[in-house]
Amino acid sequence: MKRPALLAFALATPVFAQPSALMKYACGPANRMFATLSAVSVYSDGHAGFDLNTLPGFTGQSCTSDKPFFFSVPVAEGSYRVTVVLGGDVPATTTIWSEARRLSVEKVHTEAGKSKSETFDVNVRVPEIAGDPAHHVRLKPREIGSLDWDGKLTLEFNGDHPSFRSISVESINPHEPTIY
């Protein structure tokens, strides 16, 4: 193939945006692969952390509680693949709800000291319409202040001693279709 033809082929080939970097959070000892979660890991604009005034306990290898707790990650509008490694030092049954009560993982049992990995997709929306700052989605009064439309990916951990060891969040290629 001659160089002009190769150049024409390269220019005609569509280039798609690559997914953003993987965001990883862990409840274990500090390491360079994950952001370590602790009692000071509270959600704020721009920083992932435990949200809605809930904070689990930390057992050295996992985040666990006898009550529901929330974890939020600030993200842009789009679809995300979430992988959660469940488990802890005590037996647990964990259910995960994403955003406003979307069931993502239902009653996964883990034995003490064991782990199970669960992967699911979450779609995050914001009221502003991309590319048109003058327009936005009109929210109903019941939607204002809910876990939808807020610019963050929120996970609720619930069940009998819900616990997790790590959470990974990765954006999905925007050219993949979202099916409801």
Question: Where are the language model's segments positioned?
Answer:
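Bacterial N-terminal signal peptides that target proteins for export
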Residues: M1-L6
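Intrinsically disordered, low-complexity segments enriched in polar/charged small residues
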Residues: L7-A8, L52
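Hydrophobic h-region of N-terminal signal peptides that target proteins for export
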Residues: F9-A17
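Compositionally biased, intrinsically disordered or flexible polar/acidic segments
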Residues: Q18-Y180
